[in-house]
A protein has these predicted regions:
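Extended, histidine- and acidic-residue-enriched regions that form the cofactor-binding/catalytic faces
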Residues: 1-141, 148-164, 170-369
Length: 369
């Protein structure tokens, strides 16, 4: 047990002694010069590539997409929302954070000769917790709409040969995405590798305030020091910091039960697991901010962004090393479908003998009433 954990000088920050924890510890301890080198490897910062030809499957000639898929059949799907993040920030803050992180990973893998595929976010308007209701600038989609959108995009990507899907979330709607992933698997039982990653939580240790020059000084909550810092690093022209204000939420019951956005305190409940214990956003923080964005600097976002890029690269590389393009885990181990029956569906799309998911026999329980 003594070698199970990699500790730091901060008792609340430690890492599991495995590939993931060792990677995080290395970045946590790295000098700023090494962090800068990591960011340079991924060409951070760079302008948004949403309109840049050859970045996303939607702005790349299909022939090129197919050729790249034969080398690397992993697809990244960034997920954000449209939400008030205070007068200083753009309402697409979440979307631009996550798309630029995904774009950086594509740039990096392209340099290595096997570019990961990147899909436009299907959820520019997302699901929200109840306490977001009533805020101007926040556009709330019904959870069923968000769930079905994700399920059908997963199906379409799978049908096009992108059967290893990493959905990267940048908004407070994780429970909906988790539910969609599980429903997709139950409904279709298609062999593949599917992940939803809440990227802030994936590298939560880097959002915990510590005594270091490049560290944040406050806990990550919403439209705060953490989010503004990431925005200042990745897309500073979309922010106007002279309009930033600091606020605090309002608790209506004793604290200590519900954690903040990245679960740094390991409290009994995550922030989304209740309502009524705190005032809704409209009543407590009509500014659309919970925290201190006035303290934000691009420098404070460099280590967290380096950490998520290295972690996502690890996830990507482990999948591709174990299951190269065109290969999946054994069908009989991850699906109740007969391997012989599913074989035509697993062929390269539009190749001889290939079958589309629209020819897929239905198995399993009824999925809707």
């Amino acid at each position: 047990m003594e070698n199970q954990w990699l500790t730091t000088e901060y008792p609340n920050i430690f890492f599991e002694n495995n590939n993931v924890g060792q990677l995080k510890k290395e970045i946590f301890d790295a000098p700023m010069s090494e962090i800068e080198k990591i960011l340079k490897d991924y060409d951070i910062p760079s302008p948004s590539e949403l309109g840049k030809a050859g970045s996303y499957i939607q702005n790349t000639p299909r022939k090129h997409v197919m050729e790249e898929r034969r080398k690397n059949d992993i697809v990244l799907v960034p997920v954000g929302c449209t939400e008030c993040h205070g007068d200083y920030a753009n309402s697409g803050l979440d979307t631009f954070m996550v798309t630029q992180i995904c774009e950086a990973l594509r740039r990096y893998t392209k340099k290595k000769g096997k570019p990961v595929s990147l899909a436009f976010t299907p959820l520019n308007y997302g699901a929200h917790p109840y306490h977001h209701c009533g805020m101007a600038g926040t556009i709330i989609m019904p959870e069923d709409v968000v769930r079905e959108t994700m399920i059908n995009v997963m199906l379409g990507l799978w049908n096009d040969g992108l059967r290893k899907q990493i959905w990267i979330n940048n908004h407070g709607q994780l429970w909906v995405l988790e539910s969609a992933l599980q429903e997709f698997c139950k409904r279709y039982q298609l062999p593949g590798i599917y992940r939803v990653i809440d990227w802030h939580r994936a590298i939560r240790e880097f959002f915990i305030p510590i005594k270091r020059k490049d560290s944040l000084s406050t806990d990550f909550i919403h439209a705060d020091e953490a989010e503004a810092s990431v925005g200042l690093l990745l897309f500073p022209d979309m922010l106007d910091m002279k309009y930033a204000v600091d606020t605090e939420g309002e608790s209506l019951l004793p604290g200590g039960h519900f954690d903040t956005s990245v679960d740094p305190y390991r409290r009994p409940q995550q922030w989304q697991q209740g309502e009524g214990h705190s005032a809704i956003e409209r009543a407590a923080v009509p500014e659309g901010v919970v925290g201190k964005p006035t303290r934000a600097t691009a420098e404070k976002a460099k280590r967290p962004v380096a950490a998520i890029l290295k972690y996502l690269t690890l996830v990507h590389d482990e999948i591709l090393e174990n299951y190269p393009a065109g290969k999946l885990p054994p069908v009989e181990k991850i699906s109740l479908r007969d391997p012989k029956d599913i074989e035509p569906f697993l062929r390269e799309p539009m190749s001889k003998g290939w079958k589309s998911v629209f020819e897929l026999p239905y198995i399993g329980q009824i999925n809707s009433l």
